[in-house]
């Protein structure tokens, strides 16, 4: 009898290098205890929970009772599509958990502090006849029993979806552009985009990175512009704030080779700001920017 050993490959623990750690010194969200106590009793879908938490962070996270946002801002926070965000916000507003008022291209959203108005349970999904009170069945479709017919129907649906995919993509893009007329650069799906000023800021950072690392690859300007937009819309940083902090980092003996994109700048923003305010040591690469001369901002800040 031979001795054998079974080798079990456990899944690797996924760790992000330089992962983020929660720290109260970086800020916290102040929410009334009454709201926190009532939240566990809410019967919400996953998407509704995501959007509800996003509304809480966009308001109470910034010590505000309400905020002006677009569906895209919440979509970026939650990873949901604009349509799913719109549906979830509508459901939350109908149940009086939040208030949502359309204002031009934006929405004013906030948590409804009248907790007695909250509808804790999900509404019934079945439609009822006015007089009899009878509900429609959940599914009025009777599927065929034969395998051949089912297979045929399935393939017909696939062909139909394939034929209409281009049309729906064009429709989504047109809808995106009508909702975000300021978009100067964007992906075909509209998931990533930026304004003309966001693009100029991204180009300016790219030109500075090129001075530090001349052999670096050309960046994806749509992705960089999108990150600049997120810093502006979600983090409340102005283009001038972004350029000024990157200028400081690009001259610092350590950060100049570690902050080479808007993404890394955003990730290390708080740490960079603290070091800059504390007068951290820095070493200039090239004296390209003089804070006493605002000509450096021409074309970036308008």
From Swiss-Prot:
<protein>
    <recommendedName>
        <fullName>Replication protein 15</fullName>
    </recommendedName>
</protein>
<dbReference type="InterPro" id="IPR036388">
    <property type="entry name" value="WH-like_DNA-bd_sf"/>
</dbReference>
<feature type="compositionally biased region" description="Low complexity">
    <location>
        <begin position="152"/>
        <end position="163"/>
    </location>
</feature>
<dbReference type="Pfam" id="PF04492">
    <property type="entry name" value="Phage_rep_O"/>
</dbReference>
<feature type="region of interest" description="Disordered">
    <location>
        <begin position="152"/>
        <end position="172"/>
    </location>
</feature>
<dbReference type="InterPro" id="IPR006497">
    <property type="entry name" value="Phage_lambda_VrpO_N"/>
</dbReference>
<dbReference type="GO" id="GO:0006260">
    <property type="term" value="P:DNA replication"/>
</dbReference>
<feature type="DNA-binding region" description="H-T-H motif">
    <location>
        <begin position="71"/>
        <end position="90"/>
    </location>
</feature>
<keyword id="KW-0235">DNA replication</keyword>
<feature type="region of interest" description="Disordered">
    <location>
        <begin position="1"/>
        <end position="20"/>
    </location>
</feature>
<keyword id="KW-0238">DNA-binding</keyword>
<feature type="compositionally biased region" description="Polar residues">
    <location>
        <begin position="1"/>
        <end position="15"/>
    </location>
</feature>
<dbReference type="GO" id="GO:0003677">
    <property type="term" value="F:DNA binding"/>
</dbReference>
<comment type="function">
    <text>This protein is essential for phi-80 DNA synthesis.</text>
</comment>
<keyword id="KW-0244">Early protein</keyword>
<comment type="similarity">
    <text>Belongs to the phage O protein family.</text>
</comment>
